């Protein structure tokens, strides 16, 4: 989801690898071990949770998480919890990374010390406040000065133990006085609207009886302050919980009679600092945060056109897309946006065919074909992930789920056998699993996506043409991707391919490792099977599969998925599971009488229908055909005082649903919008609030059939497999070119050197593939010019934004140190440019 700003869209995403924790404090009991899990939070909102690792003080998680971030945030936080069967799970510690600091840890493993968690560490939110100093004449005719402190509202207050009933205290404090006032308690909201005014006498009336203007003494101004404290009203015996505070020196009114601003809440000055960070252990993380500022499409035309014609450039090494792979530090970094862009415009097959053919021509040994981490390999990997994910799920998921649920021991290493286990029984169980997975893979050829088949056909042709004497190379060229880089990794780590929600337990992980090794060897068609294994027990196990029928099945499968002109006979009309999970829904009012309460239900979306049931596997309680979905929109929080709600609008009624967090809500809205995009009766307007108590809360219309009062949001492309924003991917590629501008210029130098010097290649230029220096130089010149033009647009946007930025506004509250640094940096840039 993009945050709309003037003239551009802002996209945020984060990719996280949660590695492990170490040296957690021991449990205060005889066992001393803990059952721990880790959560990922945007500020305080949990968006992901790892599995529970039992009985460990150094738990290994090994889990990956990716999400598009649909809202603004200040901190990306990680909490380590200790599970408690009888009470609320307790927090051991947390890691909080400020949004502005995320780039410091970009894409590298980092150990973070766990910090203590208390009320002060959990402070978040902002307050809108106005101070006004006025002159008042008393009943006796004496002139005095009154301070009016108006607290309008708060936003984003922390939720304590699942609830937030906030109130504020406003205190005028000085060395010899402290006068406090209190607002009303606002129930069940962390965005309270107070709009209350409190009056304080600033000076003694006699002090100003002869003055007609504001001229109170310097020492009075410097020593007085307004303090606002936010509290959560609690019925617990421990008292109300602290939510945050702010302090405003009264000298802000020295030059004006009123002052109004937004403030970030801060922890108390005397907050708890008794626990040393080292006492709580540490957590290993790898975080990749990306923020893209995307202009309208016409800005990207020159660079986009240059990239899209890459397949037609001779030689392909002189193309803009190939050059991107040459200058990026990591080939995958280039492949991800490149493949998405080319897929979006239907140019991925010609480009991959061209770079694959060029790579094959440089390969000397058919046994090493496509075995390196080249741009070709990374582009094909990314294409298979994008286009083949549904194919992978249909093929493997049922068997993988059964393996995870059965918990059968399949250990065949005699050294690792547990007491009471039988080697022959384990070997037979493993053989059955391998046979089943091998069978479903080799029979799935007709379901392989067309774009993958077209790529495999080009690989097969290029390899057969290059190594005409090797009859097996046409198979190994394809199997090196479909088996070694697609099926085998998915079996080994199913959580990375969304086949399982979390990393599997150690025993299941071991079973999947053994299956993956065997499938990889079967698919490789290597001539010496036993030599493929370092372990003798694997060589012994493989004797079960040392029959010609297995090799024939692999070849038939590879022939089918790499045949010229083959098309997927399976129509998109077949039911495809797109998304499922628990959410909370409000009764739709299908019954004339009765309470419209909220209940937890298991939701399931296919390309045919949207259903919900009590639990996974139960019969559906409600079926909504896709053609009956007229719109999918967010529901305003004020409707039910519940966050992350959206509505699925049908001809007769709307289904109100609450997702578990903002990320999940965005995912459901996006996919539901996508599958219903082509419905002919889609609405153009809707009601953003609910119909309650005889009227719509948004427009106050009394009829429940009243036409909507707000335009529907823009839809997404109606493409079930891929949802790609071409402009966003071009912006990502621009960012990479801009980041590696030094390498682009170095590559230009290499082209010049090669054009005029025929001797041995200089070492600093040897890392570049330059087949045609003149053509490569021309492309580089165009790339640098296109990147420069876009950089000017970004610089102009930053200047315009800086001019309009007001410190203390709702978007940029006072108290944000990172924003103060931004102001200072932009001021320096502006001064330098002048």
Curated annotation (Swiss-Prot):
Domain Ras-GAP: 346-561
PROSITE patterns according to UniProt: C2 (PS50004), PH_DOMAIN (PS50003), RAS_GTPASE_ACTIV_1 (PS00509), RAS_GTPASE_ACTIV_2 (PS50018), ZF_BTK (PS51113)
Post-translational modification N-acetylalanine, affected residues: 2
Btk-type Zn finger ranges: 679-715
Residues where Zn(2+) binds: 687, 698-699, 709
Phosphotyrosine carried by residues: 66
Keyword S-adenosyl-L-methionine part of the UniProt annotation: no
Name of the protein in question: Ras GTPase-activating protein 3
Species per Swiss-Prot/TrEMBL record: Rattus norvegicus
């Amino acid at each position: 989801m993009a945050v709309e700003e003037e003239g551009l869209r802002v996209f945020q995403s984060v990719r996280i690898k949660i590695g492990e924790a170490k040296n957690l404090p021991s449990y205060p009991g005889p066992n001393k071990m803990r059952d721990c899990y880790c959560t990922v939070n945007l500020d305080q909102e949990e968006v992901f949770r790892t599995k529970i690792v039992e009985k460990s003080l150094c738990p290994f998680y090994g889990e990956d998480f990716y999400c598009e971030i649909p809202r603004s945030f200040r901190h990306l936080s990680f909490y380590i919890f200790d599970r408690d069967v009888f009470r609320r799970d307790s927090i051991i510690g947390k890691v909080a990374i400020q949004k502005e600091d995320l780039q410091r840890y970009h894409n590298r493993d980092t150990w973070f010390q766990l910090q203590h968690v208390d009320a002060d560490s959990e402070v978040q939110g902002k307050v809108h406040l106005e101070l006004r100093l006025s002159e008042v004449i008393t009943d006796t005719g004496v002139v005095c000065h009154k301070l009016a402190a108006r607290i309008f509202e708060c936003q984003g207050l922390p939720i304590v133990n699942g609830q937030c009933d906030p109130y504020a205290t406003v205190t005028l404090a000085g060395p010899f006085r402290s006068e406090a006032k209190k607002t009303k308690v606002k129930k069940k909201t962390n965005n309270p609207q107070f709009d209350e005014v409190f009056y304080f006498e600033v000076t003694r009336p006699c002090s100003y009886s002869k003055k007609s203007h504001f001229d109170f003494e310097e020492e009075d101004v410097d020593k007085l302050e307004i303090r606002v404290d936010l509290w959560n009203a609690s019925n617990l015996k421990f008292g109300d919980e602290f939510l945050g505070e702010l302090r405003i020196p009264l000298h802000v009114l020295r030059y004006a009679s009123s002052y109004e601003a937004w403030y970030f809440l801060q922890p108390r000055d005397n907050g708890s600092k008794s626990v040393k960070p080292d006492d709580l252990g540490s957590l290993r993380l790898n975080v990749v945060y990306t923020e893209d500022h995307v202009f309208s499409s016409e800005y990207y035309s020159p660079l986009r056109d240059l990239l899209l014609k890459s397949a037609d450039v001779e030689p392909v090494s002189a193309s803009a897309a190939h050059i991107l792979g040459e200058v990026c530090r990591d080939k995958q970094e280039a492949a991800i946006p490149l493949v998405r862009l080319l897929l979006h415009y239907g140019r991925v097959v010609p480009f991959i065919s061209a770079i694959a053919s060029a790579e094959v021509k440089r390969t000397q040994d058919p046994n090493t074909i496509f075995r390196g981490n080249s741009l070709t390999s990374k582009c094909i990997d990314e294409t298979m992930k994008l286009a083949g994910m549904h194919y992978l799920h249909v093929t493997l998921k049922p068997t993988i789920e059964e393996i995870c649920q059965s918990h059968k021991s399949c250990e065949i290493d005699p050294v690792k056998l547990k007491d009471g286990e039988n080697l022959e029984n384990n070997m037979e169980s493993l053989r059955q699993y391998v046979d089943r997975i091998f069978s479903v893979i080799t029979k799935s050829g007709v379901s392989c996506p067309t774009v993958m088949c077209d790529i495999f056909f080009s690989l097969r042709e290029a390899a057969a043409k290059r190594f005409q004497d090797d009859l097996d190379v046409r198979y190994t060229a394809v199997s090196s991707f479909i088996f070694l880089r697609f099926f085998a990794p998915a079996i080994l780590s199913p959580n990375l391919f969304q086949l399982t929600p979390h990393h599997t337990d150690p025993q299941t992980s071991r079973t999947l490792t053994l299956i993956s090794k065997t499938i990889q060897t079967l698919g490789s068609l290597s001539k010496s099977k036993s030599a493929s294994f370092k372990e003798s027990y694997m060589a012994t196990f493989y004797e079960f599969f040392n029959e010609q029928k297995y090799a024939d099945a692999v070849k038939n499968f590879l022939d089918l998925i790499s045949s010229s002109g083959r098309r997927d006979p399976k129509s998109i009309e077949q039911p495809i599971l797109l998304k499922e999970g628990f959410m909370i829904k409000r009764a739709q009012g299908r019954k004339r009488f009765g309470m419209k309460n909220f209940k937890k239900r298991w939701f399931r979306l296919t390309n045919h229908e949207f259903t919900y049931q009590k639990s996974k596997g139960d019969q559906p309680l409600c079926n909504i055909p896709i053609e009956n979905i007229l719109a999918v929109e967010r529901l305003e929080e004020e409707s039910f005082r519940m966050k992350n709600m959206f509505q699925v609008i049908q001809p007769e009624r709307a289904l109100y649903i609450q997702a578990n967090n903002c990320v999940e809500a965005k995912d459901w809205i996006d996919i539901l919008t996508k599958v219903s995009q082509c419905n002919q009766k889609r609405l153009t307007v809707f009601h953003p609030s609910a119909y309650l108590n005889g009227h719509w809360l948004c427009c106050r219309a009394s009829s429940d059939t009243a036409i909507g009062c707000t335009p529907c949001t823009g839809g997404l492309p109606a493409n079930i497999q891929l949802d790609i924003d071409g402009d966003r991917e071009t912006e990502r590629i621009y960012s990479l070119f801009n980041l590696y501008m030094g390498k682009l210029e170095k590559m230009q130098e290499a082209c010049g050197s090669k054009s005029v010097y025929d001797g041995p290649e200089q070492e600093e230029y040897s890392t570049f593939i330059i087949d045609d220096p003149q053509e490569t130089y021309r492309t580089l010149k165009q790339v640098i010019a296109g990147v420069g033009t876009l950089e000017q647009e970004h610089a102009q946007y930053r200047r315009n934004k800086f001019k309009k930025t007001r410190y203390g506004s709702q978007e940029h509250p006072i108290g944000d140190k990172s924003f103060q640094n931004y102001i200072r940096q932009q001021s320096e840039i502006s001064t330098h440019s002048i």
